[in-house]
């Protein structure tokens, strides 16, 4: 694996000079191998090691290089034709392969090659970009989007119209991460490498970026870029110091543990916030 990484790192340093016409065989094969490994889930752009999320920047570099080495090509779809550098993940799937991999794909859901979809996942008409990782038992609901290199955990529900941000550039940025057993409410947006920790419930229409204040009403603490595990979060506002205006924030209205969450429905958690 180190040799593969070295090839990618070296090629990335001269990426401005690489085109589909002049790319050397070693680089092309290395990039294609990485995309294949991302596609199968053997590699992932970010993973949790000793309780901390670690981003493998060289894998993001390989994804960016794939845009340098490939020309646009005609892509056939169920309703139309497309013209792009990245093939669709399911272009060569037959019924036997869908059965083997064990997920459902509802038309016109679109998944780019280089994204991993685990077993028992359901993709409603939605979009999953290259480098993303969608773990077991997750529902990606209608018109939800999973951005490039985003990491979605097990048993997550991304409700209708949810946007999970992609983050190939700037290269040093970390991917957006939704940990296991989270619920993201309809039309919410989680972007810019924000981490929603395990078992959290995000209400409808909550917007989370790195600069968003995430206010815990019980403790008065303000978080940035991270929703603590087991949080129930709704949209809110915080007043300015002079009291003349207020600015948008997200509010942690309560914390729940796995036992409580298992007994109480999502709707009840969100309705009883007083």
Curated annotation (Swiss-Prot):
Keyword Transport carried by entry: no
Enzyme category, top tier: transferase
Location, primary (coarse class): cytoplasm
GO biological process: diaminopimelate biosynthetic process; lysine biosynthetic process via diaminopimelate
Protein name according to UniProt: 2,3,4,5-tetrahydropyridine-2,6-dicarboxylate N-succinyltransferase
EC number: 2.3.1.117
InterPro entries reported in the protein's UniProt record: DapD_Trfase_Hexpep_rpt_fam, Hexapep, Hexapep_transf_CS, THP_succinylTrfase_dom1, THP_succinylTrfase_N_sf, Trimer_LpxA-like_sf
Lineage, opening ranks: Bacteria, Pseudomonadati, Pseudomonadota, Gammaproteobacteria, Enterobacterales
Intracellular or extracellular location(s): Cytoplasm
Metabolic or biological pathway, per its Swiss-Prot or TrEMBL entry: Amino-acid biosynthesis; L-lysine biosynthesis via DAP pathway; LL-2,6-diaminopimelate from (S)-tetrahydrodipicolinate (succinylase route): step 1/3
Alphabetic keyword roster: Acyltransferase, Amino-acid biosynthesis, Cytoplasm, Diaminopimelate biosynthesis, Lysine biosynthesis, Repeat, Transferase
Gene: dapD
Entries under HAMAP family matching the protein: DapD
SUPFAM superfamilies: Trimeric LpxA-like enzymes (SSF51161)
Superkingdom of the organism of origin: Bacteria
A Pfam family matched in the record: Hexapep_2
Family stated for the protein in its record: Belongs to the transferase hexapeptide repeat family.
A GO CC term attached to the entry: cytoplasm
GO MF annotations, alphabetized: 2,3,4,5-tetrahydropyridine-2,6-dicarboxylate N-succinyltransferase activity; nucleotidyltransferase activity
Catalyzed reaction equations: (S)-2,3,4,5-tetrahydrodipicolinate + succinyl-CoA + H2O = (S)-2-succinylamino-6-oxoheptanedioate + CoA
């Amino acid at each position: 694996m180190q040799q593969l990484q070295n090839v990618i790192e070296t090629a990335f340093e001269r990426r401005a000079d690489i085109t589909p016409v002049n790319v050397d065989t070693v680089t092309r094969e290395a990039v294609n191998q990485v995309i294949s490994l991302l596609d199968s889930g053997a590699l992932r752009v970010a993973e949790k090691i000793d309780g901390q999320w670690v981003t493998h920047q060289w894998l993001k570099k390989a994804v960016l290089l794939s845009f340098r080495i490939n020309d646009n090509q005609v892509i056939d779809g169920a309703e139309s034709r497309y013209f792009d550098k990245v093939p669709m993940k399911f272009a060569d799937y037959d019924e036997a392969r869908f059965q083997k991999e064990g997920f459902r794909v509802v038309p016109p859901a679109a998944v780019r090659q280089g994204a991993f979809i685990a077993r028992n996942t359901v993709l409603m008409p939605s979009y999953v970009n290259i480098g993303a990782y969608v773990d077991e038992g997750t529902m990606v609901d209608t018109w939800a989007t999973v951005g490039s290199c985003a990491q979605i955990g097990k048993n997550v529900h991304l409700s209708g119209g949810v946007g999970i941000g992609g983050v190939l550039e700037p290269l040093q940025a970390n991917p957006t991460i939704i940990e296991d057993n989270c619920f993201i409410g309809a039309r919410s947006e989680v972007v810019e490498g924000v981490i929603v920790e395990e078992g959290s419930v995000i209400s409808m229409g909550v917007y989370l970026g790195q600069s968003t204040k995430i206010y815990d009403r019980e403790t008065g603490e303000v978080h940035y870029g991270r929703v603590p595990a087991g949080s129930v979060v709704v949209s809110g506002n915080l007043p300015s110091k002079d009291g003349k205006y207020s600015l948008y924030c997200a509010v942690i209205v309560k914390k729940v543990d796995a036992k409580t969450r298992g007994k109480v429905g999502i709707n009840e958690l969100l309705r009883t916030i007083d």
